[in-house]
Amino acid sequence: MSDVITTDQPASATSLLQAKGIANLVERALLTEVRLTPKPGLVDIRNSGAHKDMDLALFEKSTLAVAPWMENFYQLGYDTSALEAELVLPMLRPIGMACEADMLQATGGVNTHRGAVFSFGLISAVTGRMVALEEELEQNRICYWVARMCRDLVAKELSSEATNAATSKSVEHFLHYGLSGARGEAESGFQTVRTVALPIFERIRAQNEDMNLALLQTLLHLMAWNNDTNLVSRGALKGLYYVQQQAQKMLWEGGVLMRGGLEALQAFDDELIARNLSPGGSADLLAVTWFLSHFPKGETFAD
């Protein structure tokens, strides 16, 4: 791992234990997501999805490179708990950049987890903050603090006033299509996860002990309703709408829970590979869903 970013305040034994626990849970979330099979257009055990430059082994290697950095995000969140939440976000960037550098070194320059580093870096920092403030780690409270930390993030980073001629894909998606991507999801406190993914996942888990089926059905719901900018990058709005419509159609018929559901999902996978479409944003949100499912729901906060 690259040089660890330290803070002046010594970490307590409890804080270090919590930090390691959060990092381990993030690692499990990322490995659970990538090994889930079959996933339409995504890397899994069956194939490399619509990707020519990555496979399961590379994702696993990348996970082992990025997960330890979650302890650093956590510790910074813990150490800055007295500050206004939105002031902490810029402080996380150097850790994120160092984490990405380790990821790229591990993968030979392939971007496997940039979106996941963004989401889980925020979540890890927020959990550190909550432990410092002696708050219970709950799904909605974690999402509330992520929203607070990312207040006005879209306007600050994606609006026309915040950009110049040298625009990124994220800025292009926002200015041309009004799609805010991972930044918008974070600013909303993972609204898609809270209102779509977690309720579906937890309901199926309560009715069915099969974790894989619950996750695959949840992924279909995310693909149906998430405005995944990864799909826009590969297939423009036409690609996004195609995936959403096909996922909605499959869910209308029962999804993976219907007879022949897994075979239908494999056919969906083959079709997305042929179209070079990969819903990577939804995959990241599925990992976030699995992570948050390990905490009690808590009180709902107003969006």
Swiss-Prot record:
GO biological process terms, semicolon-separated: prosthetic group biosynthetic process
EC number: 2.4.2.52
Disulfide bonds: none
InterPro entries for this protein: CitG, TriPribosyl-deP-CoA_syn_CitG
Domain of life: Bacteria
Reactions mediated catalytically: 3'-dephospho-CoA + ATP = 2'-(5''-triphospho-alpha-D-ribosyl)-3'-dephospho-CoA + adenine
Similarity section: Belongs to the CitG/MdcB family.
Function comment: Catalyzes the formation of 2-(5''-triphosphoribosyl)-3'-dephosphocoenzyme-A, the precursor of the prosthetic group of the holo-acyl carrier protein (gamma chain) of citrate lyase, from ATP and dephospho-CoA.
HAMAP family: CitG
Protein name: 2-(5''-triphosphoribosyl)-3'-dephosphocoenzyme-A synthase
Gene giving rise to this polypeptide: citG
